[in-house]
Each structure stands twice: as C-alpha cells, then as structure tokens.
C-alpha cells in the first residue's frame, strides 16, 4: 500500500519499493521542494501547516511555469498541529507511568489547554490548543488534489461529525463551521514576510 513518509530517511528507504505521500513534517512551502519530492517518487506532496493562501498560489504558479503541469498536492484542512515532540513522558517523571493509557492528559496555561499524545516508547507529542479548521476555505483552494482531516484526540462521534461537515463543504454548503473559540485558520489567511 501507499506509505505516508515524513522524513528523508524514510523516502530513501522506501522510494524504490513502495508508493508514498510525503507528509507535512517536510515543511513544503515552495515549488522547488515539491518538484524535488516528485522526482524522488512522491505520489503526492503534503504542504506545510505554515503555508498561506498567497504562498500556495505562488507555489502552484511557479511549478506550472517550470513544469508545464500542476503538482499533486495534499493539504491538512482539519486537525491539531503538533507543537512539540519530547523524548520523555511527563507522567513518568511524576511516577504515574502507564496512566496515559487510561485517560487523556493536557498541559494548561492561563489561556489554553494543550493535549498530550503519549506514545508506546514513552515519548510524547504536545498538540496545539486550537484546532486548525480550514473546512470553510476548501472550495476556494485551487490545485490541491487531496484534503486531509487529521484526527488525534477526537471521539468517534466527533470524527463522524467532522467528516460530514467536510463532505457538506465539498458539496457546496455555505454554512460556516469555523468556531473562533476552539478553532484557528493558522497562517492560511495571513501574510508571512
């Protein structure tokens, strides 16, 4: 099957044996990166969480000009972006090893809660306190072949609801699903200098 690869070591290991999609962690924001990944065999290139609308248009235009065709792109339009990867487990440091398998934990500051994903090897991923939600933007995003919904801590019911909202958007719904209290559009509508 098709692999999702987030590092160059994985690309070089599997490029000749498995079809693959490059992941967001390669931080792709320009046409040269897309071209290189396609040359290395990527069937589709996932764009960086950091890309904005103008950068996406510039990337697509430059790629088309240089290659007489559009790139095969994927974009994450829903999900909690990872903010920090740690080599240790905060629960283990507090002598509560194993509790992460029983319930969900989070870091709290004065404004937000940051969910903690615990992994089998006692590493952790700290997730953004706000959810990237570009579902309202999907129909205006051109030349992106696949939109990804990246689920991490959502319940089964939430997953079903979000998939239905995305399908409604792709079918032309104009009802906004963006919640300013819980969601962010990330950098998408911002100018990055």
Where are each of the predicted segments found?
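Active-site pocket-lining/capping segments in soluble small-molecule metabolic enzymes
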Residues: 1-193
């Amino acid at each position: 099957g098709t692999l999702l690869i987030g590092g160059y070591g994985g690309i070089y290991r599997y490029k000749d044996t498995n079809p693959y999609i490059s992941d967001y962690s390669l931080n792709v924001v320009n046409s040269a990166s897309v071209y290189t990944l396609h040359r290395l065999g990527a069937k589709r290139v996932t764009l960086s969480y950091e890309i904005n609308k103008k950068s996406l248009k510039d990337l697509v235009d430059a790629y088309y000009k240089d290659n007489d065709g559009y790139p095969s792109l994927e974009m994450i339009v829903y999900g909690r972006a990872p903010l920090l990867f740690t080599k240790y487990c905060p629960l283990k440091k507090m002598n509560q090893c194993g509790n992460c398998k029983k319930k969900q934990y989070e870091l709290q500051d004065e404004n937000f809660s940051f969910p903690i994903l615990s992994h089998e090897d006692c590493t952790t991923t700290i997730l953004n306190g706000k959810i990237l939600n570009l579902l309202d933007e999907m129909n205006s995003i051109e030349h992106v072949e696949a939109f990804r919904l990246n689920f991490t801590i959502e319940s089964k019911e939430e997953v079903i609801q979000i998939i239905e909202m995305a399908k409604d958007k792709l079918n032309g719904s104009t009802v906004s699903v963006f919640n300013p209290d819980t969601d962010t559009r990330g950098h998408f509508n911002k100018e990055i200098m």
